[in-house]
Design a protein with these regions (language model features):
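Phosphate-group recognition and catalysis centered on beta-loop-alpha active-site segments
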Residues: 1-153
Length: 153
């Protein structure tokens, strides 16, 4: 038996907030989560953003918006409010950059992030290239990050 029981907040506190958003992450920590799983996608300019899908079909309002065809600057200005679940309640929530979790990691030494490299991500950048990118961005907090993926080939 694990004592105390430790849970991973999958995409943050996504039962109450739009998944993979900064509000979902911070609310999960406020609720006591010590492990947060987030998903990573890459933009056309090969920069990381936090999103499960490589498009806005579920989380945004533009079904034809695909990350691999857009620069990161365009992506991070898109709402990630999950209108199908929450209407416009979280319309101000945007697709976060990976760098946006740095202050959270710095302010919460008790929290570890599991960062999932999605299949679409590894089609744009191979696994080693992705690890190099993560290492550069997360260099000061790398000990608080675990990289996971179902597609390492």
């Amino acid at each position: 038996m694990i004592d105390p029981l430790q849970l991973v907040a999958h995409r943050g506190l996504q039962s109450n907030y739009p998944e993979n958003t900064l509000i979902a992450i911070t609310k999960a920590i406020e609720a006591g989560a010590r492990f947060i799983e987030i998903d990573l996608q890459y933009s056309k300019d090969r920069l990381p953003v936090i999103s499960h899908d490589d498009n806005l079909n579920r989380v945004g309002a533009n079904a034809n918006f695909h990350f691999h065809n857009r620069n990161r600057k365009e992506i991070i200005n898109q709402a990630a409010h999950e209108p199908g679940r929450f209407g416009d309640k979280f319309i101000e929530e945007k697709i976060p950059k990976l760098e946006d979790i740095l202050p959270i990691l710095n302010n919460h030494p008790e929290v570890t992030f599991f960062i999932e490299l999605k299949q679409e991500t590894l089609h744009q950048k191979d696994f080693q290239d992705s690890l190099n990118t993560l290492s550069k961005i997360l260099k000061n907090v790398i000990e608080k990050v675990v990289v996971i993926s179902f597609d390492l080939e």
